A protein has these predicted regions:
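A "functional boundary" signal
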Residues: 2-11, 16-170
């Protein structure tokens, strides 16, 4: 009788632990897009495009992550963005969730959006916000990209001292 209770207690404990540390599961094509993003963004975008029909039926968190990946792939392919509506929606979601790693990345792409729109002051503000969030995250690669973008934008505006400081941070 005691061993039965112990087994039930251990099983209950195991179930609680596994539920607490449940990892997000993504559709296989989305996982493939993540794997391809850095080296083959065109293939990553093709994977994401093939998912676009079904994304509206997904949970909001998964749908927003899909949108972030799509923005990321288009940025890597130098496809210019002409509106900040989508990236603002993504940022709003991650701010509500207090998801700093994704929020940092979203602000980076907001900066890229404004850079593409030739709005340097708003691009700088977005990149600085990403850098601020980056102090709480451990994504050295993205932090380097953020400061690299800031250095370029400062140099473009002939703010050479600020450009040098951003270069040193990168």
């Amino acid at each position: 009788m005691k061993s039965g209770r112990i087994h039930i207690l251990l099983l209950s404990l195991l179930l609680c632990i596994s539920c607490r540390y449940e990892q997000q599961s993504y559709p296989p094509l989305m996982e493939r897009a993540v794997q391809l993003m850095e080296t083959h963004p065109d293939s990553a975008l093709a994977c994401l495009d093939s998912l676009s029909i079904s994304t509206t039926e997904w949970p909001e968190e998964l749908h927003i992550y899909y949108l972030l990946l799509t923005v990321k792939a288009k940025d890597k392919l130098y496809i210019p963005v002409t509106s900040d509506t989508l990236i603002n929606r993504i940022i709003s979601f991650y701010e509500d969730k207090q998801d700093d790693p994704h929020l940092m990345e979203a602000y980076y792409y907001k900066g890229s959006t404004y850079r593409d729109m030739k709005d340097a002051p708003r691009a700088v503000d977005a990149f600085l916000r990403a850098a601020e969030i980056g102090k709480r995250c451990s994504n050295d690669t993205l932090n380097g990209r953020i400061y690299g973008q800031l250095a370029s934008l400062f140099a473009f505006q002939r703010l050479y001292h600020e450009s040098m400081e951003a270069t040193q941070q990168a």
